[in-house]
């Protein structure tokens, strides 16, 4: 099994959106052997469900997110791929675990966009724009993981 974690600050907007989208895309593409998680580097929202804006956008696109609650990224976490939403999250992850073993990337490294960071819709309220960024990056990320981890599609 391959473990993938999406990480943002509070784990209520961007990373749970990415977790839900990634899970759905893996199902759509009939790819098994991948566990998908989301975590936050801040403690403010622990145990809370995704933000209402994240829930709304996922519901509009018929992407399930049942049972998701905010969890903290911890030094003991062991993931094969850690996908941060922005440079601040990369820095926080490296501070939490300086000896991180998993492969650490920013999500937009897998996009064709000029931006390098996914903006936090908690502050911008642009959940649709963030959805588009995440959705457009997930298939390229899946392609990378399938090749890198020698997984089979279909």
Curated annotation (Swiss-Prot):
UniProt entry keywords in alphabetical sequence: Hydrolase, Protein phosphatase
Name used for this protein in its record: Low molecular weight protein-tyrosine-phosphatase PtpA
Reactions performed catalytically: O-phospho-L-tyrosyl-[protein] + H2O = L-tyrosyl-[protein] + phosphate
Database matches in InterPro entries: LMW_PTPase, Ptyr_pPase, Ptyr_pPase_sf, Tyr_phospatase_low_mol_wt
Residues at the catalytic site: 8, 14, 120
Source organism, top-level taxon: Bacteria
A GO molecular-function descriptor: protein tyrosine phosphatase activity
Enzyme class, UniProt record, top EC level: hydrolase
PANTHER family membership: LOW MOLECULAR WEIGHT PHOSPHOTYROSINE PROTEIN PHOSPHATASE, LOW MOLECULAR WEIGHT PROTEIN TYROSINE PHOSPHATASE
Protein family membership: Belongs to the low molecular weight phosphotyrosine protein phosphatase family.
Keyword check for Cell membrane: no
Main function: Dephosphorylates the phosphotyrosine-containing proteins.
Gene designation: ptpA
EC number annotated for this UniProt entry: 3.1.3.48
UniProt-listed Pfam families: LMWPc
Species whose genome carries this gene: Staphylococcus haemolyticus (strain JCSC1435)
């Amino acid at each position: 099994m391959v473990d993938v974690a999406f990480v943002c600050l509070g784990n209520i907007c961007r990373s749970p959106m990415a977790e839900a989208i990634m899970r759905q895309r893996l199902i759509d593409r009939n790819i098994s052997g991948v566990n998908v998680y989301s975590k936050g580097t801040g403690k403010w929202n622990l145990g809370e469900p995704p933000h209402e804006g994240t829930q709304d956008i996922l519901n509009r696109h018929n992407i399930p997110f049942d049972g998701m609650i905010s969890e903290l990224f911890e030094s003991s976490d062991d993931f094969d791929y850690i996908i941060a939403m922005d440079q601040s999250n990369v820095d926080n992850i490296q501070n939490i675990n300086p000896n991180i073993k998993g492969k650490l990337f920013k999500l937009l490294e897998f996009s064709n966009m000029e931006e390098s960071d996914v903006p936090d819709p908690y502050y911008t309220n642009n959940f649709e724009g963030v959805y588009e960024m995440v959705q457009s990056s997930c298939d390229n990320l899946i392609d990378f993981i399938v090749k890198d981890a020698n997984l089979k599609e279909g």
